[in-house]
C-alpha cells in the first residue's frame, strides 16, 4: 500500500509527446518501435499534436496499435487541408488559420470517438495525460487524466490543448464531459 501511495504522490516516468504538427509523424515512428520491442510505457503525456498522437496509443490495445500503426497511416494524417489563400481568408473572417471542424474530425478518429479518460484507461490500462492552459492567464496549466478529469471526453481535451490564439478558434477550448446518462455536454 505504501509504495502505491508513493508512486501516486511522487509520480512515475512518462513518455512525453510534444506539440507541433511536424513532430506527429516522428512520434508515431517512435511509438511503433517501442511497441514492437514491448517497451511502450504505461503513462503517456501529450500537448497539442503530441496529445493527438498520444490518443492513438491510449485508446487502443497493443494488437489494435499493430494494425493501425502502419505506413499508410501517414496518408490519414493531414494537419493542413487548405491552401494558403484559404487560411488567410479564414483568418480574416474567424481569427483562426485552421478549420476547427476538420481538426475535430481528425481528433475523433484518433480517439476512437467520444471516449473519456476513464473509459480509455479501463480499456487499455494506459494512463493518458493531456495538458491544457486555462483562459485565465493567472491560472496554472491543467493536467487532465483518468484521475483528475475521468469523464472528460479526450478529443475535446486535445482540441483545448491545441487552442492557440490565431491558430484555431477559441470555441474549441471548451472541454466536454460525458454524463453517466445522456449526451456529451460542454463543461469546463
Model-predicted segments: where are they?
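Gly/Ala-rich beta-loop-alpha elbow adjacent to hydrolase catalytic centers
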Residues: 45-46, 50
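Short glycine-enriched nucleophile-adjacent loop
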Residues: 51-59
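Patatin-like phospholipase
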Residues: 1-44, 58-188
